[in-house]
Amino acid sequence: MAAPPSPGRTADQADQVCTFLFKKPGRKGAAGLRKRPACDPEHGESSSSGDEGDTVAQPPRVAPRPRGLHSWQKAAHGDRRGEEAAPESLDVVYRSTRSAKPVGPEDMGATADFEQDTEKEHHTPTILKCSQRVQEALRGREHDHIYRGIHSYLRYLKPKDTSMGNSSSGMARKGPIRAPGHLRATVRWDYQPDICKDYKETGFCGFGDSCKFLHDRSDYKLGWEIERELEEGRYCICEDENHEVGSEEEEIPFRCFICRQAFQNPVVTKCRHYFCESCALEHFRATPRCYICDQPTGGIFNPAKELMAKLQKLQAAEGKKR
């Protein structure tokens, strides 16, 4: 239901809607610009020339170019100009020698001198030798009053116990000794692995896994030994040498660590180290500690039954092979 019109107003005035006008904000910088006055078509050129001083002329706007493209075009034009300006006489052409030998000395610079060293004519030992020759030539003669340089003054007394007096021996030299100019050596490298000596001889190493040497009981031959066998025709003929050692055999020490001989009545300590009975008792008289790990044994040496059984098994296997 519509509300009744207020008293004192007509129906047409009540239906009218009030509108609000908002002022648009002006552009920044527009306040400092002058407006160009409107010119009449009748005045023509006179009015335009008269108002020329009051108007502000704006330069035409140029679209900016990308910096990379601009620099690339400049560099390309610069290269083209350089190519056009370069004369044809700068072209380098190499003619083939039709030879397989390298260009240069045949010894490939092996007899070349070191350019940073002093020249041999001005080297201190050379000057000393020249001075000695002059002194020997003038010895016993009268002075001829000829100047031969600062190093060739006549000496009436023969120097002794000095670098000049002992220089003939070759052990004492005056000034720095010149290194040999030409030196060529032929070196041959051969591979020889570092094998743990204790493990190879006894089958046990006190360092264990921390040992930096190779734990292997195999026999190694050097390169010259293999070449000699190849020349004599004895290489890989003996089949007994081509065998592999099992992992079970590697854990068995096959020799005493004290005497480095085969076990005689082997005994074992509390720290699980194996020795001959006589070697263990003799060492116990000197010290009650273990020979390998230096732990106290307490005088307890048990018979190594496991070791004896394994050694007998190995001996039986070797007897069958024979």
UniProtKB/Swiss-Prot annotation:
Residues spanning the signal sequence: none
SUPFAM superfamilies assigned to the protein according to its UniProt record, in alphabetical order: CCCH zinc finger, RING/U-box
C3H1-type zinc finger span: 190-218
Compositionally biased tracts (Low complexity): 46-60
Entries under InterPro entries matching the protein: CWC24-like, Znf_CCCH, Znf_CCCH_sf, Znf_RING, Znf_RING/FYVE/PHD, Znf_RING_CS
This protein's UniProt keywords: Metal-binding, Zinc, Zinc-finger
GO MF annotation: an example: zinc ion binding
Protein name: RING finger protein 113B
